[in-house]
Amino acid sequence: AEEAREETMRMLNIYADFFENVLAMPVIKGRKTDKEKFNGAEETYTVECMMHDHKALQAGTSHYFGDGFAKAFDITFAGKDNQPHHPHQTSWGVSTRMIGGIIMTHGDDNGLVLPPRIAPVQVVVIPVAAHKPGVLDAAAALRDRLKAAGIRSKMDDSDNSPGWKFAEYEMKGVPCL
């Protein structure tokens, strides 16, 4: 029983850490009331992500089932005493609402700014006055230094105007232009 309870809390903490440190979303961890908990669970814990409108989005849950489901489905294992025992079970998960939460947290009227840790491209180097001597070479050198530092980066040396490029990559969610 203790191991299952520890697993329930471990997963809750993993989710909270992921939301805060990877997705850059503030969270509140808590325990659901008896009326709110998962049907059949002894305890349900939640990670609530805080949105800009001051509302919370339930983004992940972790449940401790005890041995109730194991008894209902006659699930047993042989213990150290070679006798059958019902395991204590857990269940935990996040859902696609996490994607909506990212958009609600990091989006605005101009698009989405993805958190740097999940952005496919973290930095786009946009040369301005690319027709002037040395500008493209300097921009390429900057891109290369960023890549060498492990930053997912690219340079846009297309014929589109700098303004178009800034708008395009802002809309695509690139964190740094």
Show which residues each predicted segment covers.
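NTP/phosphate- and nucleic-acid-binding module
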Residues: A1-L177
